[in-house]
Design a protein with these regions (language model features):
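Histidine-acidic residue clusters that define the catalytic metal-binding segment
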Residues: 146-162
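His/Glu-rich zincin catalytic helix
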Residues: 1-53, 57-65
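M16/MPP (pitrilysin/insulinase) zinc-metallopeptidase core fold and M16-derived inactive scaffolds
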Residues: 43, 47-99
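Active-site-adjacent, His/Asp/Glu-enriched structural segments that form or flank metal-binding
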Residues: 78-150
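A sequence-composition feature that detects small, non-aromatic residues
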Residues: 5, 28-32, 52, 62, ...
Length: 162
């Protein structure tokens, strides 16, 4: 089998940021779908997110994005990476990291400041509803905003080559 694109990114060089992971096209229509790598931790160097806070960010992120005034109709998916170092955001259209950055900042401001009941955290709405950690989700979102998104540069918007 061929090596998939996400395994071709050198995870020893990868740092937190907002990257275009891939752009796919529907063979029938030519419609584009862009997948973003929202990397919150440095792979293999920093601790990964625990499942509870990762799950909370997923619930808050999906709710925020699917209700966003400008972007809701273009959101395909938001969810965690299996390695728990970040999230994938999939949107309709060919979109750059620079173009999605304001939305990503809004998203993580929402998560950082969220208080109250986590949307979808009830047994009839989620298959693992008890696995939530709002305080840690708030903290991780604030860290990502302050450390990585506030003054983001080119190196953290485009994958680096070895």
């Amino acid at each position: 089998m061929e090596r998939i694109a996400s395994f071709s990114v050198d995870h020893l060089l990868l740092e937190p940021g907002v990257y275009v992971s891939r752009i796919d096209r529907d063979p029938a229509t030519g419609a584009a779908v862009t997948t973003f790598d929202l990397r919150l931790t440095t792979p293999n160097k920093e601790p990964v997110m625990n499942t509870a806070e990762c799950h909370t960010i997923e619930h808050l992120g999906a709710t925020f994005l699917r209700n966003h005034a400008e972007w809701s109709g273009r959101i395909v998916y938001f969810g965690p990476m299996g390695c728990r170092t970040g999230f994938y955001l999939v949107v309709f259209g060919e979109v750059t990291s620079e173009e999605i950055l304001p939305l990503v900042r809004e998203l993580f401001e929402f998560v950082a400041g969220f208080e109250g009941d986590v949307p979808g955290a009830a047994p009839e709405e989620c298959g693992n509803y008890l696995d939530q950690n709002l305080p840690m989700a708030n903290w991780l979102a604030r860290c990502y905003l302050d450390r990585d998104l506030a003054d983001i540069d080119e190196k953290h918007l485009h994958y680096q080559q070895a």
